[in-house]
Each structure stands twice: as C-alpha cells, then as structure tokens.
C-alpha cells in the first residue's frame, strides 16, 4: 500500500471512529469512577455529547491517524509499539489542539467549549484520547480498505 493511501486510510478511520471510542470510554469512566446517576443525565443529552466529542476530537484523532500511518516499518509493524505511539500521540495532539482552541477566542466563545477545554477537565480529555489512540492503533490493520495481501513494506523516504 502506498504511503499516501495509508495516510488517508488511517486518518479517516481515526477521525470517524476515534471520538466515538473516546466517548464510550468516557461514559464508562464516569459510570465507575463518579456517581452512576450522572450517567442518566449523559444519556439524556447523548446526541449533544456525541456532537461535542466529534467537534473537539475529530481533528486530533485524524492527526493521530496520520502520525500512526507515517510510522517507520520497524515501529509500525509491531502492535505493541504502534499502540504505545498511538496512545501517547493521541494525548499530545489533543492537548496541543485544545491549547490552540483556547487561544482562539471566537471558537471558544461558548460556555460549554470553555468548560470542556479548561485545565480543570484534563482527565476528561486525556482518558478518551489515550484509550482511543491505543484501540484505534490496535484495530486499524483489521479495518476494511487495507490491502492485507500486500504487507506494508514501503518506506517513507
């Protein structure tokens, strides 16, 4: 598979599935770590919750997918290292993206955006980004569109 096709494949899958996986882990975290009654409130506003996760998480997830696609063969072919890089990259890219958004006042003008992007809710951003990066890095080679018969042996140079 060519590098450009792998970048598009990984970027799109990460952007579409990454925020949804992050929401799943965040809901589980809230259910087990906080009060289970808060989960009832989240279920009532789940469409808005999903929309907010996609608007704040799709671009960092896509950039994480591009980063995972551009890994050298020695790192990208080993699941353990690919998951490690995907998780760390997801957290770092998400935090950089949120810092940029906070400094752009027009995009962060609503109280809901400011609440999500504030430093007080760091766990709400880190846990979904870390786990979505790890899970997506693990399953990306099994998703449709990747030519399994042709191993990824092309170099990036």
Curated annotation (Swiss-Prot):
UniProt main location, coarse: membrane
Which cellular component, as a GO term, is one annotated location?
plasma membrane
Ranges facing Cytoplasmic side: 1-11, 58-83, 147-157
Q: Where does it localize? A: Cell inner membrane
- Give the way it sits in the membrane: Multi-pass membrane protein
Superkingdom, natural source: Bacteria
Which family does the similarity line name? Belongs to the CbrB family.
Record's protein name: Inner membrane protein CbrB
Parts of the chain that traverse the membrane? 12-32, 37-57, 84-104, 126-146
Sorted keywords for this record are: Cell inner membrane, Cell membrane, Membrane, Transmembrane, Transmembrane helix
Q: Which residues lie on this side of the membrane: Periplasmic?
A: 33-36, 105-125
């Amino acid at each position: 598979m060519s590098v450009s096709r792998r970048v598009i494949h990984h970027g799109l899958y990460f952007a579409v599935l990454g925020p949804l996986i992050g929401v799943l882990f965040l809901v589980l975290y809230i259910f087990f770590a906080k009060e289970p009654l808060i989960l009832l409130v989240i279920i009532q506003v789940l469409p808005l919750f999903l929309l907010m996760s996609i608007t704040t998480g799709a671009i960092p997830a896509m950039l994480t997918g591009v980063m995972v696609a551009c890994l050298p063969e020695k790192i990208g072919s080993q699941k353990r290292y690919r998951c490690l890089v995907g998780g760390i990259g997801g957290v770092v890219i998400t935090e950089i993206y949120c810092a940029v958004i906070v400094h752009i006042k027009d995009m962060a003008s609503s109280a809901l955006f400011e609440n999500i992007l504030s430093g007080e809710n760091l766990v709400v951003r880190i846990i979904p980004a870390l786990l979505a990066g790890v899970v997506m890095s693990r399953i990306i080679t099994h998703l449709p569109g990747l030519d399994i018969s042709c191993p990824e042996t092309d170099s990036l140079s």
